[in-house]
Regions:
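Conserved NTPase motor "head" modules and their coupling/switch loops across ABC/AAA+ ATPases, GTPases
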Residues: 1-31, 171-309, 318-322, 326-329, ...
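Nucleotide-state sensing region of NTPase/ATPase domains
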Residues: 47-123, 127-129, 133, 138-141, ...
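Walker B catalytic acidic pair
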Residues: 313-315
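Structural motif
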Residues: 95-96, 271, 361
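An accessory alpha-helical subdomain
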Residues: 115, 121-214, 224
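Structural recognition of the conserved hydrophobic beta-strand(s) that form the central parallel beta-sheet
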Residues: 72, 336-343
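Post-Walker A helix-loop "phosphate-sensing" segment adjacent to the P-loop in P-loop NTPases
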Residues: 45-57, 295-303, 334
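Conserved P-loop NTP-binding catalytic core
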Residues: 11, 15-94, 152, 166-167, ...
Length: 370
């Protein structure tokens, strides 16, 4: 899989950009503030329909413009023309000029893995950061997961609204409230099972990568659902959720929010039974996240039968020589890699010699080699 070309209009600091990309390694370079990270962000938006840097789509539109457009051609046995149109109040998603209503179907067309400075938030950040990670990775594997988590969030909002109404003393349709809770449990079963299966798959790959980099055993990812589960069988999950809902309804009404379900899940990075969030050095944390991201490559290859596109946003300046080599040896020659950097000296000469070089200045290509 690779991104053949990219067209951007009115995105961040870009008026207009049309760029052809190499099937191998591409290096986007230039001074700070010229648009390198914005360029990678546009590729991320093209893949996921949303940004990893902003929750608000209108922030992606160039100031004083009404809309932004991102287009790209993905080659994966057959070509797909993907397009995102961002307006201030809505978003259009297209495949081959046809509008797409099910975003899950769109997301599976283009698989990417991004390495960037905020990756440490996967360990240091809030549980919501880790849930977001799980949701995005599983959505690349399964369109059904994306659709299910979206349905779950809509149902959750409705249930929380009902809890607020009960708290305010309003009469509600009790039968509908029960049906709503049943629907939430049904969606939860699928989400719990998919997340557990993904964590299990990570733990077949991630510890070996961590050991190869550090020489240390005992690394694992530990899934922490918001309910106590002896196993992930359908009936076990349903019964545990039902018990949690029944035993805590008064508390939920009091705080006007659903207390149990996948929206409160978390996972931890553990080394020799110690949580790296609390006890790991920053070096260990970086290697743990690096191992996680490298594991994603293998998992996507196994599930999709093709390699994802790798985005490296100025990460070489933060890695020592050994970590750079550890990263690069896990990236196959047949993968498309798009790297940003402020200084070509941060990248080994043998990589530069086989790469397409693109210099960006003030949102424009000013030099292109190969």
């Amino acid at each position: 899989m690779f991104l053949k070309n990219l067209q951007i209009k009115n995105f961040r600091n870009y008026d207009s950009l049309d760029i052809s990309l190499s099937k191998g390694t591409n290096i986007i370079y230039g001074n700070n503030g010229q648009g390198k990270t914005n360029l990678l962000e546009s590729i991320y938006v093209l893949a996921f329909t949303k940004s990893h840097r902003s929750f608000i789509d209108k922030n992606l539109i160039k100031s004083d413009k009404e809309s932004a457009i991102i287009k790209g051609t993905i080659l994966n046995n057959i070509p797909y023309n993907l397009e995102i149109i961002l307006n201030k109040n809505k978003k259009q998603v297209k495949i081959d000029n046809n509008s797409v209503s099910k975003i899950g179907t769109y997301i599976e067309k283009m698989n990417i893995i991004i390495f960037y400075s905020e990756d440490l938030n996967l360990i240091k950040g809030f549980p919501s950061e880790r849930r977001k990670y799980l949701n995005l990775e599983l959505s690349q594997i399964s369109p059904n997961y994306y659709n299910t988590i979206n349905d779950y969030n809509k149902l959750l909002k409705i249930r929380n609204d009902y809890l607020k109404r009960i708290n305010n003393g309003e009469d509600i349709n009790q039968s509908y409230f029960k049906i709503l809770t049943d629907y939430i449990m049904e969606k939860s079963v699928f989400i719990y099972q998919m997340r557990n299966k993904y964590i299990e798959r990570l733990n077949k790959v991630c510890p070996d990568i961590f050991k190869e980099i550090t020489g240390r055993d005992g690394f694992k990812i530990v899934y922490s659902p918001s309910i106590n589960l002896e196993n992930f069988e359908k009936e076990t999950i349903r019964n545990s959720l039902l018990e949690a809902f029944n035993n805590n309804l008064e508390k939920e009404i009091k705080i006007k929010s659903t207390l149990y379900g996948p929206h409160h899940d978390d996972f931890d990075f553990v080394l020799n039974e110690e949580n790296l969030r609390n006890y790991g050095s920053q070096g260990q944390q970086r290697i743990a996240v690096l191992s996680l991201k490298l594991s994603e490559i293998k998992i996507l290859q196994d599930y999709k039968g093709t390699s994802p596109i790798i985005l490296l946003d100025d990460v070489f300046s933060e890695l020592d020589h050994q970590k750079k080599n550890n990263l690069l040896k896990f990236i196959d020659n047949d993968m498309q890699v798009i790297i940003t950097t402020t200084d070509l000296d941060n990248i080994d000469k043998q990589i530069i010699d086989k790469s397409k070089l693109i210099k960006i200045d003030k949102g424009k290509i000013v030099e292109e080699v190969r």
